[in-house]
A protein has these predicted regions:
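Active-site groove signature of glycoside hydrolases
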Residues: 56-59, 119-150, 199-213
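Glycan-binding loop/region signatures in secreted carbohydrate-active enzymes
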Residues: 95-107, 247-304
Length: 304
């Protein structure tokens, strides 16, 4: 873990200089978290783990009867590799259905029943301990406003069931005020969730998204507004800021209800710019890079 220059490999050679430990940083402690699918390339995982404090394994789900759904492919190997590097694995529970979409109906079926809520909390705590996790990461989206307190109750109950030393992360929609309307925001009470959780993750990304108009994924002015509001409700020591490492490729002109952007990693974006000989520019407003390119389509025309 103290030698990220090894690139995740465990082989060392005579003459190499290794770091046994670091002196205390004059800047204080830095904590990081990353999300991982169980099918991640293992070499990429090993290269990344030295930089992570926590690793949220994506993801467990649940059915309407409260039974948990394990992540596709299993989590045993991911947990084991994370521990090799001293990274704490987190059991991520989402409100994603078996079809792969976030469901407010699924959330409602859980949080409307105190009995079911207690059952899921108990199953979460038991699974986290048995599987070797070091905590739980809750990622419930599109919570109807009337179940905001029920969500907080789930977090509080989970706190009483997890062993000492385990942590609870809760992901928060990017709100800028307590009164912000919309299904994505109304079920997330920043103050109450911040008090109940050990840490929160601000989802400061996805302003630009697959079906929306061309926008920066995380424009700086909007990100700042979310952080400033979060700081008014939650201690700064509990806040993790979400940072995207991807972008989107839109075909222009954008047509609402029809256009669908393709996601691509930062490296893929750089590669695409090189292939198209596109000039990478910088938006002073969003404080983010972008580029345009032209491509001949199958009908013999050109698209931007």
């Amino acid at each position: 873990r103290n030698n990220p220059t090894l690139g995740g490999k465990s082989t060392v050679y005579p003459g190499q200089t290794l770091n046994i430990r670091y002196e205390v940083s004059p800047l204080g402690d830095v904590y990081t978290n990353g999300y991982v699918y169980t099918y991640v390339n293992r070499d990429v995982l090993r290269k990344t783990l030295p930089y992570l404090t926590y690793l949220s394994v994506f993801s467990h789900g649940f059915k309407e009867d409260g039974s948990l759904l394990p992540p596709e492919g299993g989590d045993e190997e991911i947990i084991s590799i994370a521990k090799e590097y001293g990274t704490i694995p987190l059991l991520t529970l989402t409100s994603i259905t078996e079809n792969g979409t976030f469901s407010s109906e699924l959330v409602e079926s859980l949080l409307s029943s105190p009995v079911l809520t207690s059952s899921v909390a108990a199953s979460l705590a038991e699974t986290a301990v048995e599987n070797g996790y070091g905590g739980v990461d809750l990622d419930f989206e599109y919570i109807p406003s009337q179940y905001a307190d029920g969500y907080v109750a789930l977090i509080n109950e989970l706190q009483t069931l997890l062993p000492e030393g385990y942590v609870i992360f809760t992901s928060l929609a990017p709100k800028t005020s307590a009164a912000q309307s919309g299904l994505l925001y109304e079920g997330h009470d920043y103050g109450k969730i911040g008090a109940a959780s050990d840490y929160v993750l601000l989802m400061t990304y996805e302003w630009g998204y697959t079906y929306g108009p061309p926008l920066a994924v995380a424009p700086k002015p909007q990100v700042r507004q979310v952080i400033e509001y979060a700081l008014s409700e939650i201690p700064s020591s509990k806040i993790f800021m979400g940072i995207p490492n991807y972008g989107y490729d839109w075909t222009l002109p954008y047509v609402r209800g029809e256009s669908k952007a393709q996601s691509l990693s930062n490296i893929e974006a750089l590669r695409l710019a090189g292939e198209k000989n596109a000039e990478i520019m910088f938006s002073e407003t969003a404080q983010t890079p972008y580029f345009n390119y032209f491509e001949r389509n199958s009908r013999g025309g050109a698209s931007e």
